[in-house]
Every structure is written in C-alpha cells, then in structure tokens.
Amino acid sequence: MINMTRKLYYEDAYLKEAKGRVLEIRDNAILLDQTIFYPTGGGQPHDRGTINGVEVLDVYKDEEGNVWHVVKEPEKFKVGDEVELKIDWDYRYKLMRIHTGLHLLEHVLNEVLGEGNWQLVGSGMSVEKGRYDIAYPENLNKYKEQIISLFNKYVDEGGEVKIWWEGDRRYTQIRDFEVIPCGGTHVKDIKEIGHIKKLKRSSIGRGKQRLEMWLE
C-alpha cells in the first residue's frame, strides 16, 4: 500500500478540527485520506480526540507512512464516509510546548555545558513534563539555576521556530540555533513555551543523568 494519508498536522499544527474520508477499516483501526491526529513517534505521544464523536484510543503510523486511528466503536464507520475530526487541543498544545521546550533545552545545555561536552542518550515527554537523559561527568545540579535562568531568558525574548523539509527529512530550528531533525509538532514562537517551573536532576547510573522539566 502506498502512503495515502495527507498529514494536516504538518501543514498546520494549530488545526483543531478537520474533515476526512474513510479509505479503509482494519479491525478497530480506520485509515483516512487526511488527518489532524499526530501518531505516536519521535518520543511524542499520539493525539487524543474524536472522529464523528467516537473516542480515538490510539494513533499509529504504518511502514508506508499511513496514519491509522484506533477507535472505540469501529462499527460506526464504513469506507467512503466523510467524518469530522476533533483533537483534544489542550492536550496537543501542552505537548507542542514541551516538545519545543526540549529543543530549547538542548541549545541551553550546549551553551552552559559546551557543545560536544555532553551527549543526549535518551528523551521522552508526556503532557506533564519533558525528559532528557544525558551523559556528562559532573553533577548537573551544579548548573541547574544557570540552565533555568538562560532558558527563561530566551522564552521572554521569543523567537521563531522554523520547520522545513529536505526530501523526506524534516528539520526544525529555533532562531539561529542548532538545526535538529524532528518529526514532531511545535509551537510557532518560543514565547509560547512558557517558563520552566521545575527542573529535576537524578542519576540513572554509569555516568548518565536524567533531567526532567516541568513548564509553568
């Protein structure tokens, strides 16, 4: 099967509602011609919401890049139906802020620790917080206040988040900072991220540390 899903969440990450047409149904998963639902990937959880008022339980991408929506009541759909899509915008927007916030944190760590002096070994996010797992020899608590202060300063200044494609690779860049390959959804300006409310450092063994970030 070729890729048949138009990914509206890449064209406009701020779309909250859209229409789509059912192309195929497999068990409890439906394939649409276009979608605003972001599928799980790149450390970012899938969107929540409804299709024709039916709850969406999971969203995933297959090997061809088609986006499948696992729904609570698949029997309410048939191939050819035109359907109404609505995402849980509060949930998505929190994830957008956290995802862009992690990219900004990466730049701040490069400034504070020195680019090339630390290594990102893992990451993740939920609607509550973002996480980076880092290989670095010194205890990051030493730099915590500096990291928070610089992060919040950049947020106050603001700056455009640029997104573009090169072939099938998607790239993001905050201001004139690092270019980061990324398939996630992001805010348009880093002012939208908000300040860091809490930054927690913990050891995860063998010279690796975890930074967890909560936003205001």
Swiss-Prot record:
Highest taxon above the source species: Archaea
Native source organism of the sequence: Pyrococcus horikoshii (strain ATCC 700860 / DSM 12428 / JCM 9974 / NBRC 100139 / OT-3)
Cofactor binding comment, as recorded: Binds 1 zinc ion per subunit.
Protein name: Alanyl-tRNA editing protein AlaX-M
Stated family: Belongs to the class-II aminoacyl-tRNA synthetase family. Editing domain AlaX-M subfamily.
An individual GO BP term: alanyl-tRNA aminoacylation
InterPro entries: Ala-tRNA-synth_IIc_core, Ala-tRNA-synth_IIc_N, Alanyl-tRNA_Editing_Enzymes, Thr/Ala-tRNA-synth_IIc_edit, Transl_B-barrel_sf, tRNA_SAD
Pfam families xref list: tRNA-synt_2c, tRNA_SAD
Protein role: Functions in trans to edit the amino acid moiety from mischarged charged Gly-tRNA(Ala) and Ser-tRNA(Ala).
Localization: Cytoplasm
Gene that specifies this protein: alaXM
One GO cellular component term noted in the UniProt record for this chain: cytoplasm
